[in-house]
Regions:
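Auxiliary Fe-S-binding modules of radical SAM enzymes
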Residues: 1-13, 57-58, 65, 183-287
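Canonical Radical SAM [4Fe-4S] cluster-binding loop centered on the CxxxCxxC motif
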Residues: 12-55
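Short strand->helix junction
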Residues: 25, 42, 80-81, 177-178
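Short, basic/glycine-rich phosphate-binding loops at helix/coil junctions
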Residues: 35-40, 69-72, 133-137, 167-169
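Conserved alpha-helical substructure of the radical SAM core
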Residues: 38-75, 89
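Short, well-ordered alpha-helix to beta-strand connector turns
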Residues: 70, 123-124, 234
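Glycine-rich beta-strand-to-loop/alpha-helix junction loops that act as flexible
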Residues: 74-80, 107-108
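Conserved AdoMet/S-adenosylmethionine-binding subsite of the radical SAM
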Residues: 83-226
Length: 287
C-alpha cells in the first residue's frame, strides 16, 4: 500500500488534488470531534522526523508517471502535516518539479513556531482551520494535545499571514449550537477582519459522518446565517456553494486495491467519486 501519496481526490476547492501524507495515520495535535477519520491515536505538540524526503519524492514520481497532471499537489491526510520536520523540504522539492501548485491544509496549531512558518512560506496556497477565538470552545471542539493552546494558534496565524506571499484561505468548520452563536461569530469576525492578506473564508460542515455522532451538519440556512454574520470584505463561501470536481482522473494503469485503500483511509469518497478517481464506470464498483 502506498505509504505517503494518495489520490488524486475530487476536491470541492482544488479540483483533482494529489495528496501527500507526511506522517503516520491519526497522528495529530488535536482530537477534533468533527473529524471524519475516527479518533486520534497519537497526540503530539511538537514536530518530529517521520519519513524520508527521498522516499516521499520517489513515491510521488511513481504516481505522477501513471496519471494526468493534477490541478494541485496537497499536503494533508489523516493527521497534521506540520508535525513533520521535513515539510519545508518536501514543499521545495515538489515545487522544483514544476508540475502543479502546492497547497497545505493545516489545523494551524504549530504556526507559532518560526520554523513551521518558514517551512510553509514557499507553498502556493495554505488553508488553516479556525473554528473559534474562545479557549473554552476550542477545548470543547478540538480536545488538543497537552501544550497546544488557542492563544498560540491565533498569534501564529497572524504572524504567518503577515509574511506569507501565497493564497491564504481560512476554513471554519461550523458546528451548530457550538461555534455559530452570535458571540462566536462576532469573535471570529473581529479576528478575521484584522488578519493580514486573507484571501477568502470557507465554511465547512459535517458532509461526511464525524467521529462524534452528536455532531450534526449545519443546514444551508445556518451556513448562510454565519456567512452573513461574519460580514467580511473578503469572499466567504460555504461547502454547499462548491461541488466536487467532475474531472476524471486519467490513468495509464488500473489502480491497485492497495492504492484505493490508501485513498479511503485519508479521504472517504462516494462511489461516484471513486469512479472518477479510478477512471472506471460506477457499475463496475457496485456490489
Amino acid at each position: 500500500m502506498p505509504k505517503y501519496v494518495f489520490g488524486p481526490v475530487p476536491s470541492r476547492r482544488l479540483g483533482r488534488s494529489l495528496g501527500i501524507d507526511l506522517i503516520p495515520p491519526k497522528t495529530c495535535t488535536l482530537e477534533c470531534r468533527y473529524c471524519q477519520l475516527n479518533t486520534t491515536t497519537e497526540l503530539l505538540c511538537q514536530p518530529r522526523e517521520f519519513g524520508s524526503t527521498e522516499e516521499i519524492l520517489k513515491e510521488l514520481n511513481t504516481t505522477l508517471d501513471d496519471i494526468a497532471k493534477p490541478d494541485w499537489i496537497t499536503l494533508s491526510g489523516a493527521g497534521e502535516p506540520t508535525l513533520s520536520r521535513s515539510i519545508g523540504e518536501v514543499i521545495r522539492r515538489v515545487k522544483q518539479l514544476h508540475l502543479a501548485p502546492v497547497c497545505v491544509i493545516t489545523n494551524g496549531t504549530l504556526l507559532h513556531l518560526p520554523e513551521v512558518r518558514k517551512a510553509l512560506f514557499p507553498a502556493d496556497r495554505v488553508i488553516p482551520t479556525l473554528c473559534t477565538v474562545f479557549p473554552e470552545t476550542f477545548q470543547k471542539i478540538h480536545r488538543p494535545a497537552p501544550g497546544v493552546d488557542l492563544c498560540n494558534l491565533l498569534k501564529g496565524l497572524s504572524l504567518f499571514a503577515s509574511h506569507f506571499q501565497g493564497v491564504l484561505e481560512v476554513e471554519i468548520f461550523v458546528i451548530p449550537g457550538i461555534n455559530d452563536t452570535p458571540r462566536e461569530v462576532a469573535g471570529l469576525s473581529r479576528y478575521l477582519a484584522a488578519l493580514p492578506r486573507l484571501a477568502a473564508v470557507y465554511l465547512n460542515t459535517a458532509v461526511r459522518p464525524p467521529s462524534d455522532p452528536t455532531i450534526r451538519a449545519a443546514t444551508a440556512q445556518e451556513l448562510d446565517n454565519m456567512k452573513n454574520g461574519l460580514a467580511l470584505v473578503v469572499p466567504v463561501t460555504t461547502v454547499l456553494d462548491h461541488q466536487p470536481t467532475s474531472k476524471r482522473v486519467i490513468r495509464k494503469h488500473q489502480a491497485t486495491p492497495e492504492g484505493v485503500l490508501a485513498l479511503l483511509l485519508r479521504h472517504p469518497c462516494t462511489i461516484e467519486q471513486l469512479s472518477q478517481v479510478l477512471d472506471t464506470p460506477v457499475t463496475s464498483l457496485e456490489p
